[in-house]
Amino acid sequence: MLKKRAVTVVAGLTVAVLAACSAPQTPSVSSVEGDQAAVAASGSKPNIVFVLVDDLATNLVEYMPTVKAMQDEGASFENYFVSNSLCCPSRATIFTGRYPHNTEIITNTAATGGGYYMFKGRALDQDTFATDLQAAGYRTAMMGKYMNEYQPGSPKKPSANNPAGWDEWALAASGYAGFNYNLNQNGEVVHYGRAEQDYLTDVISERGQDFIKRAAAEGEPFMLELAPFTPHKPYVPAPRHENLYKDLKAPRVASYDKKNKNAPSWMASQKLTGPRKKKMDEQFRQRVRTTLSIDEMIADVKAQLRESGVADNTYIVFSSDNGYHMGEHSLISGKMTAFSTDIQVPLVVTGPDVPAGVKVEDLGSNIDLRSTFGDLAGATVPASVDGQSLAPLWSGGTNDRQHLLVEHKGMEVDKMDPDTGIFRSPIPPNYAALRHRDWLYVKYNNGQREYYDLTSDPYEMNNIVGKITKKRLLTLDRLLKDVRQCAGQEQCTHAHAEPASVSELRQARRRAKAKADELLEESTSPSATATPSPSASSTPLGAGLPSAN
């Protein structure tokens, strides 16, 4: 559980009284109430601008000067991962704060187990961070990409599927090419053509800035999500950027064009040919070019916040729905794996109480964004969410999370799906994975497994699952089973608790017993009162320690 800042939840949680050797203390209720009083005294809740991009790998941040400046100005999460490295399942998780096994959105289309119509059909659109903030008095707006299969309608017949939780919106469906799309603007559909000013990222940037200007002028706290379709395939940059970086190549990292040792069967036949490498280099150049307009959008939004006088009271959050691989592990362009290329994405936050240049090492996930936004806004977040607020982490707090879950459903190629219909990269079969800071464990439904020691093998090249003990494997399988069934913040956090080794348990219990004996001796000394110490009498030995089972 996170320390320092508590998310408001519908159901109360029981707080365990820990032994003297337990985790750092949380602040008192009065200190939290003091923070809330300070916000109230200022007369304004903080605003939030959330920039969610599509398929952006961490290696693209290097080409985004505004985002790099945000890293210097605020907090960067060094171990932030998505729960599914595919667009729609990840976005469903971001909206709801729940793992894919709880949203049941596991693919991009209704035909295969996901998409907008399933999201809406399960009433998940009524239960998101947008509805939380709207209920807390926020003015909300979303621009760009919503969910796969969402349709805006046509100018003559606008869609009646207005997104719940959003006061304003400007949403497209087929915006991947950047031009020639319909945009549903608050129920009115406008067609944008192929003129330079019709480039989708620029259009949503302008509309977002206009929203900020109006909301700030009216003194309303606001949540704005800007969700460009880039750098997703087909990687179309703004015309002003299309001739830049002519000599750039996809990064030749240690795993580039290298086959994994003891790779699972779905990877065995992969090979990078000369033409494929050349094609990927061009694709990488295009991806970099598409990020330039995103970076400019963020710079323009920051300028508008300053002009509107609300920059000092606004959080800006930058992230991606998933990552992307280009040549690593001898795989051609794609995603959906459990490798870091696909599941580790940027999360950068600036705002009123975010110290400059903070690097957060604790594990974070896209299940956490809903709770984080609720925390910042003082909104009520349901206890049924799986995530927890990340806000305490940039102020020196910690969490006790040890692992994160990654889920994936292997899919048949669907020509209507932008993530499978145009893919040539192999799609992994069904798997579930545990991501730790120091290792990665993947279990496929066909029985194959992978285990990578990230301390000695940071590029995830040597699958050593055959070298770990049977006991360790059973422990990993039990952990994986537990977290795949978890629901709610408490369960999903503590389902991750890995048993310590027997020797570690014995040492910890000896320390706990010694502390208890010391407290008991103090309580029975002549100078002590007749009432036993609560720490010694009511706390069982080993309280708060992991089970050895």
Regions found by a protein language model. Name each.
Residues D35, V39-G43, T58-N59, A173-L200, ...:
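Active-site-proximal cap/lid insertion segments
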Residues A164-Y176, N322-E328, P355, I367-R370, ...:
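C-terminal cap/loop subdomain of S1 sulfatases and analogous C-terminal strand-loop tails that border
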Residues I48, D54, L133, K145, ...:
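A short aromatic-rich beta-strand->coil structural motif
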